[in-house]
């Protein structure tokens, strides 16, 4: 009987359920009564988000083999055959950790949205649709379907910014949609070009595209377009300017979704499409990714250091940390690429925690200016402890996830022999500047908020209530995996080792056949540097 039950679980459409269940459930919300403060809607949304998280955990436990490098949990149903469009979903080691991260962060974001009283039905409707849409981005195995889910996710974010944001919410929401929707046209063009390549019958499935023998010029053309589209979402400097504005106007739960999940879509897409499907072009552009990653780290760290607005300071900190993802993807090292994957998971947790605390602090002080938000440590001691723990995680304190991921990226890039030694030394030295700046601006931020000169107007006019149990619980849920990964990284790295090794093997083959430049040393051994077993 247990065997039959296990067989039933293995055949269950886990990924389709994790996508369609929250989206379908969202359409029940309009039938809730409008009276009251939306308590019923909040509990309903939380139950749906938690169930979705359990479904994704079930997919990992019952149907995912960490030693299998191929796509698993595959579901393939013909949808619009005349257009070559199929409902094709699946998960490998690159997508599964991000699927789990999405459902986990969304459940906590729903809990973070508990104080929302303005149009709660629409708010939680959008959150649940966003949950299913973001899981779909990581799960779909068809490039045209990927484009559709990528676009679907933009609508809830736009409305969440435009309706529940700050006083400049319309500007921030419009800028977000112009940047992201405008750049998405390159995804559609690349999908059509790759799907129709060499045939009159289109096929957009990843497995088909990976087997195609695209010419180098064709790959470069598609690579550039996709780099722009995904670079906006990551974001890559100078395509980043929408992010500080969006974070500057968003509410705490939307902050968590932006920092925890949305930025990871760009990093995932670079791995999935640019590195995996276009290896010849990736061999040519990988040095540029390294340079862009270093620029991200230094520029955003310096800009964050100069910010006097708390939300914008943390927003630029996020941009800086995503620079490590670019370096890892461009490293041609299994260790470095594995570090990029871990950095996405790690920053998803850390970024969500910091932005939640930003929102919680603003709810009490009603200001984001560091000059006005000073000396509140005596009034909010628990909040100070939570801020300290999350800030230490962000500055990559040993024993926390950020330290391991950044160390893996640095070590993978510096020790790999694909690039010349001078290039590696120069890039690593420059990136180290950003690493040094991070603790400076984060610790000085803590000092200003909690131990600066007390603002009498703030402390007398505002009732500065310390962190409540709901807030402590949310941060505890985020800190637990942050510390767990920091102490035992294999909790996450084992899930994607096989897929990362397969990806790097494909890219190294392209490097060996590429025209040698003064950046590549050409001394890479035939053996592939295996991903870490730490």
From Swiss-Prot:
One GO cellular component, as annotated: plasma membrane-derived thylakoid membrane
Catalytic activity line of the entry: a plastoquinone + NADH + (n+1) H(+)(in) = a plastoquinol + NAD(+) + n H(+)(out); a plastoquinone + NADPH + (n+1) H(+)(in) = a plastoquinol + NADP(+) + n H(+)(out)
Protein's GO biological process: ATP synthesis coupled electron transport; electron transport coupled proton transport
Keyword Transmembrane: yes
Keyword terms, alphabetized: Membrane, NAD, NADP, Plastoquinone, Quinone, Thylakoid, Translocase, Transmembrane, Transmembrane helix
Chief place of localization: membrane
Classification via InterPro entries: NADH_Q_OxRdtase_chain4 (IPR022997), NADH_Q_OxRdtase_chainM/4 (IPR010227), NADH_UbQ_OxRdtase (IPR003918), ND/Mrp_TM (IPR001750)
Places the protein is found: Cellular thylakoid membrane
Membrane-crossing residue ranges in chain numbering: 12-32, 44-64, 94-114, 120-140, 144-164, 176-196, 220-240, 251-271, 285-305, 314-334, 340-360, 384-404, 425-445, 472-492
Its EC number(s): 7.1.1.-
EC category: translocase
Membrane topology designation: Multi-pass membrane protein
Molecular function per GO: NADH dehydrogenase (ubiquinone) activity; ubiquinone binding
Keyword rRNA processing: no
Top-level taxon: Bacteria
Cited function: NDH-1 shuttles electrons from NAD(P)H, via FMN and iron-sulfur (Fe-S) centers, to quinones in the respiratory chain. The immediate electron acceptor for the enzyme in this species is believed to be plastoquinone. Couples the redox reaction to proton translocation (for every two electrons transferred, four hydrogen ions are translocated across the cytoplasmic membrane), and thus conserves the redox energy in a proton gradient.
Family label: Belongs to the complex I subunit 4 family.
Name the UniProt record assigns to this protein: NAD(P)H-quinone oxidoreductase chain 4
Organism: Prochlorococcus marinus (strain MIT 9312)
């Amino acid at each position: 009987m247990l065997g039959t039950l296990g067989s039933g679980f293995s055949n269950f459409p886990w990924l389709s359920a994790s996508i369609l269940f929250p989206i379908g459930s969202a359409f029940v919300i309009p039938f809730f009564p409008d009276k009251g403060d939306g308590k019923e809607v909040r509990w309903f949304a939380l139950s749906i988000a938690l169930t979705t998280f359990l479904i994704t955990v079930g997919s990992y436990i019952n149907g995912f083999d960490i030693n299998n490098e191929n796509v698993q949990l595959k579901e393939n149903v013909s949808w619009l055959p005349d257009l070559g469009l199929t409902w094709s979903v699946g998960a490998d080691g690159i997508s599964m950790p991000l699927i789990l991260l999405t459902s986990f962060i969304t459940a906590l974001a729903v809990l973070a949205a508990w104080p929302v009283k303005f149009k709660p039905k629409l708010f939680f409707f959008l959150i649940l649709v966003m949950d299913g849409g973001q899981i779909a981005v990581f799960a779909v195995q068809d490039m045209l379907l990927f484009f559709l889910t990528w676009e679907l996710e933009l609508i809830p974010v736009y409305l969440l910014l435009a309706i529940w944001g700050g006083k400049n919410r319309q500007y921030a929401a419009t800028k977000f949609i112009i940047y992201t929707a405008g750049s998405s046209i390159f995804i559609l063009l690349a999908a059509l070009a790759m799907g129709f390549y060499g045939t009159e019958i289109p096929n957009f499935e990843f497995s088909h595209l990976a087997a195609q023998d695209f010419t180098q010029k064709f790959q470069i053309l598609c690579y550039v377009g996709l780099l722009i589209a995904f670079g906006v979402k990551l974001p890559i400097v100078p395509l980043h300017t929408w992010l500080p504005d969006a974070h500057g106007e968003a509410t705490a739960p939307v902050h968590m979704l932006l920092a925890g999940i949305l930025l990871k879509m760009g990093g995932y897409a670079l791995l999935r499409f640019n590195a995996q499907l276009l290896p010849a072009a990736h061999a040519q552009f990988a040095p540029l990714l390294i340079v862009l990653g270093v620029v991200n780290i230094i520029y955003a760290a310096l800009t964050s250091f100069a910010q006097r607005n708390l939300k914008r300071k943390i927003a630029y900190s996020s941009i800086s940390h995503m620079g490590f993802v670019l370096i890892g993807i461009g490293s041609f090292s299994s260790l470095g690429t594995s570090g990029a994957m871990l950095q996405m998971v790690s920053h998803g947790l850390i970024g969500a925690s910091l932005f939640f605390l930003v929102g919680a602090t603003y709810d009490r002080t009603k200001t984001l200016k560091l000059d006005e938000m000073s000396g509140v440590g005596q009034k909010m001691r628990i909040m100070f402890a939570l801020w300290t723990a999350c800030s230490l995680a962000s500055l990559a304190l040993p024993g926390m996830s950020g330290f391991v991921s950044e160390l893996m990226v640095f070590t993978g890039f510096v020790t790999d022999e694909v690039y010349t030694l001078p290039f590696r030394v120069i890039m690593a030295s420059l990136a180290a500047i950003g690493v040094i700046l991070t603790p400076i601006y984060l610790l000085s931020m803590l000092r200003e908020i909690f131990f600066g000169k007390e603002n009498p107007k703030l402390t007398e006019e505002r009732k500065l209530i310390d962190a409540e149990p709901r807030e402590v619980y949310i941060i505890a849920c985020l800190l637990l995996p942050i510390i767990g990964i920091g102490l035992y990284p294999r909790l996450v790295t084992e899930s994607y080792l096989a897929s990362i090794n397969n990806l790097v093997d494909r890219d190294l083959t392209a490097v060996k056949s590429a025209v040698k430049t003064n950046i590549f040393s050409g001394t890479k051994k035939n053996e592939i540097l295996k991903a870490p077993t730490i």
